[in-house]
Structure formats: structure tokens, C-alpha cells
Regions:
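Phosphate/diphosphate-binding glycine-rich loops and adjacent basic-rich segments that engage nucleotide
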Residues: 145-200, 338
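Solvent-exposed alpha-helices and their adjacent loops that cap or buttress functional pockets
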Residues: 32-34, 42-45, 78, 112, ...
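Active-site-proximal betaalpha loop/short-helix elements
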Residues: 92-96, 196-273
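Acidic, Ser/Thr/Pro-rich beta/coil linker or hinge segments at domain junctions
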Residues: 3-6, 10-15, 296-339
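Glycine-rich phosphate/pyrophosphate-binding loop regions near the starts of catalytic domains
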Residues: 8-163, 168
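Helix N-cap motif at beta-to-alpha junctions
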Residues: 281-287
Length: 339
């Protein structure tokens, strides 16, 4: 029987085999492809260039804003500043209007102006076989060579912090794409609040990263996206070769987000989670970093600790220590599959 892959990220085991064969022979490539590595890094002389490419596939609303912020988040995890964007727009045949194209591009331009990013190129076309727009961004950032942070930097004893909570992005997408299914459980004001998770608490983590890095010794950062926090923890563990021990009860899940997930029967820890930033911080600096974020009105929780390898993620509670399951796909994909 043919093995058909589910919607979502390519399984880590397959991806790992594929990436192991990638030709990366240029000595200027300091960080190439790998599980849990948000960006590539290239030595450009005085500074390092950081590269990221990411699509928007689930959402159909505010696509341009999503695109810029999702790519900027990954650049932020390296301590770099996002600088230059290229975007590709694949638009559905028979549905695309000039107003649609202008709307998406206007959103991209507005988000780039807000983050001081220059749009330097890209591609757009009307494409056969699509039922909705698919857009892809490639973002380049810049960081001084002595300030680079990668997921490989997590060390035993570091504290594991999470900003804002989860799943911010899933909450916004579900409220925007399936309002009729939520209207039976949420009053109009709550539904509007869930829709506005796109901007409050927001999908961007560039500010979170800047504050954290300025406040203490951040050793690694990772951006939870598809597969949610659970997948992000596993990716960070694999990238660093460390074991992560968390208390699942410490994970901040906003009440409204939990209710939205409950309507669809989703695990909040396994749903797309842009807007949160996962950090490992030197133990002696963890309180200082957390307080700096909280003073900036950014929720920050201490989830647990980094331990020696081998790579793994463990839930530690009063009942004992169990391995945290790694999701096979993103919870939100099930909802789109039902629609």
C-alpha cells in the first residue's frame, strides 16, 4: 500500500535522511539545513547573513502580514535583524482579482515598513490547481558574528522559557477561518478577541527576542510553528542534542485559546503556535530575562530545564517522568481536512 504523507511538516525521520544528503560544500556556510534549525547562516565578512524561507499555507486572511511576521520570527531566533525580503505569490486560477493581489502586496509592504525590512524582489503568478492563495517568503537578516545564537547552543542547566503562551496562531486562524463553528460557544466579543490574536498578543517575536538577549545570556531560541510547542521542544532537543525536562502545567495557555481549541477537540500544545518564543537561558540569568519580558508586558513562563543528552523531551510532574509525545502533524490540519 502506498505510504501517503499527512498534511503538515514532512516527518522528521524522512527529512533528516534527505538533509543529510544536501550538498553543503561552501566553507562560508556556517549553519546549513537540519532538524530544528530555523535559519541558515553564511559568513559575509564583518557580519553574518541569516537566511529563512517559509510559506503561509493554512490562513487565507491577512496573508501578507502573516508572511512577513512568520519569516521575521525565525530570523529573530538567531539574534539577527531582518533586513531584506523576497516573496512568491501563487494565486488561484479563476478566483484572483487585481484587488486580491493589491491587498496581499499592501499587507506585505505595511508589515515590512513596520519592521524596517526592504522588499527586494520575488515572483507572482496565477497558478493552475490551487483553491486559495499560497505565498512564500525568503527573508535575509544580518547579525554581528559574535552575537549569533543558534538552537545548538542550549546547555545542561539552562532554564527553558516560553513567552506569551500557546497556541496564539491557531486561535487566530480558527476564529478567522471557521467563525460559524465558534459562534455557538463564544459571544461576539470573544470571537472578535480570538480573531485579533493576530495582533494582540500578536504573532511577532522580534521584540521578545530583542528584550531577552539584552537582559541576559540567551543560549538558544526556537520559534514554535506547525506541530505547536510539543514539536518545537522536540526540534530544539534534536538540534542541541540535549534532553529537555518540562512541567506541562507551567505552559501558559490563555483561557480563550483553550476554549477555541476545545470546540475543535485540539491539543493546545500541538497546534500551530507562532507568537510564542522558546528560549534557553543561563540559569543565573533566567529570572532577570523573565522579569525584563514581564516589565515589557510580555508573559514569560519557566517551563523547566535543559539536561544532558541524548535528545529527548520529558514531562516531569508529581506523578513521575514520561516522554512528551511528538505530534505526527499539526492539530489544526485536522480541522481543515474536515471542512
Amino acid at each position: 500500500m502506498e505510504n501517503i504523507l499527512a498534511v503538515g511538516k514532512v516527518p522528521a525521520s524522512l527529512l533528516e535522511r534527505l538533509l543529510a544528503r544536501a550538498p553543503v560544500d561552501d566553507p562560508s556556510v556556517l549553519l546549513g539545513p537540519g532538524i530544528g534549525l530555523d535559519c541558515a547562516v553564511v559568513d559575509a565578512g564583518r557580519n553574518l547573513l541569516v537566511f529563512k524561507s517559509d510559506p503561509i499555507t493554512f490562513a487565507t486572511d491577512e496573508l501578507g502580514s502573516y508572511l512577513v511576521r512568520i519569516n521575521a520570527n525565525d530570523i529573530a531566533t538567531t539574534g539577527a535583524e531582518p533586513r531584506w525580503l523576497l516573496s512568491t505569490l501563487l494565486l488561484p486560477e479563476g478566483r484572483t482579482t487585481p484587488e486580491m493581489v493589491e491587498g496581499i502586496m499592501g499587507q506585505i509592504y505595511a508589515a515590512c515598513r513596520e519592521l524596517n525590512i526592504s522588499v527586494i524582489g520575488g515572483h507572482s503568478e496565477i497558478t493552475y490547481g490551487l483553491d486559495r492563495p499560497i505565498i512564500v517568503g525568503s527573508l535575509i537578516g544580518e547579525v554581528p558574528r559574535n552575537e549569533l545564537i543558534t538552537p545548538k547552543g542550549a546547555r545542561p542547566g539552562d532554564r527553558l522559557l516560553l513567552t506569551k503562551g500557546v497556541p496564539i496562531e491557531a486561535t487566530a486562524i480558527l476564529a478567522r477561518e471557521f467563525p460559524e463553528r465558534l459562534s455557538h460557544e463564544l459571544v461576539p466579543e470573544e470571537l472578535e478577541q480570538a480573531r485579533n490574536y493576530l495582533s494582540d498578543p500578536g504573532l511577532g517575536v522580534l521584540r521578545d527576542a530583542r528584550i531577552a538577549v539584552a537582559a541576559g545570556r540567551v543560549t538558544a531560541m526556537h520559534d514554535p510553528t506547525e506541530g505547536g510547542l510539543s514539536t518545537a521542544l522536540w526540534e530544539l532537543a534534536q538540534a542541541s542534542g540535549r534532553s529537555l525536562e518540562i512541567d506541562p502545567g507551567k505552559v501558559p495557555v490563555p483561557t480563550l485559546a483553550a476554549r477555541v481549541c476545545g470546540v475543535f477537540g485540539l491539543d493546545p500544545l500541538a497546534a500551530i503556535a507562532s507568537g510564542a518564543l522558546l528560549l534557553t537561558v543561563a540559569a543565573e540569568d533566567a529570572d532577570r530575562v523573565r522579569h525584563a519580558l514581564e516589565e515589557a508586558d510580555i508573559v514569560c513562563a519557566d517551563l523547566g530545564v535543559v539536561a544532558e543528552g541524548p535528545a529527548g523531551v520529558w514531562q516531569v510532574t508529581t506523578a513521575g517522568r514520561d516522554e512528551l509525545p511528538c505530534p505526527a502533524g499539526d492539530e489544526i490540519a485536522r480541522v481543515f481536512g474536515e471542512d
